[in-house]
Amino acid sequence: MAELTQRRDIPRLIEDNVYYCAFNSPKSYGGNSYFVRHPDGNWLIDSPRFTPLLEDRIEQLGGLRYIFLTHQDDVADSAAYARRFDAQRIIHEADRRAAPGAEILVKGVEPFAVHPEFKVIPVPGHTRGHCVLLYKQKFLFTGDHLEWDIEKCALGAYRDYCWYDWKEQTRSMERLLAYGFEWVLPGHGRRVKLSADQMHLELRRLVARMKT
């Protein structure tokens, strides 16, 4: 019974139709990945390990239409999931070497709406091609761009792990002030839910800290 319950709990519901996949992969340095169940096709955000259990559960939930890769570090087993479910992988062209054959390449720094409810926002900094995904103006999947720092009880971004350009990452963070969202769902670190107003305030505070 416990095993059956565990199977039903994977992926694990966060809120609404957004799930945490578990099965974090060492290929992505243990990064988190997420699943969105959607009537127009399901999404995988970054890649977990390819495991029979998760493969079966994703199939039961309707398969995959898109695999959104925030950046080159977190592709893990995305190619295997793409083959299994005939899904289209989305990654910025600047990070495309990590996902050769990706079906959709994001270019430049302009936001890209794959679907009316899903907006890809390029945020270069951690890597040159890092992007975040905004879903329903509520959930922001942030990869390694943004997380919740539980020690400081504040949004965080880390200069020591910025592989491309910190000033560019700061500018990218500031551009996120144009959007409203309640959830930050990171690749590493803690996720957090705040009111949209509080999230905007915390983001402004973070940008100010990054500029000092």
Give residue ranges: language-model regions.
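Conserved beta-strand hairpin/beta-sheet module of binuclear metal-dependent hydrolase folds
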Residues: R7-L54, C131-W148
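Redox- and metal-dependent alpha/beta enzyme cores, enriched for Fe-S-associated oxidoreductases
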Residues: T70, D77-A80, R89, F139, ...
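Short His-Asn-centered micro-motif
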Residues: I45-P48, L69-H71, H92-E93
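Short active-site oxyanion
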Residues: G41-W43, G63-Y66
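Active-site-proximal loop/helix segment associated with metal-binding centers of metalloenzymes
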Residues: F23-S33, E93-D95, A99-A102, V106-K107, ...
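Metallo-beta-lactamase
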Residues: A2-D16, N42-L44, F50-T51, D56-E59, L64-D74, A79-R128, Y161-E182, ...
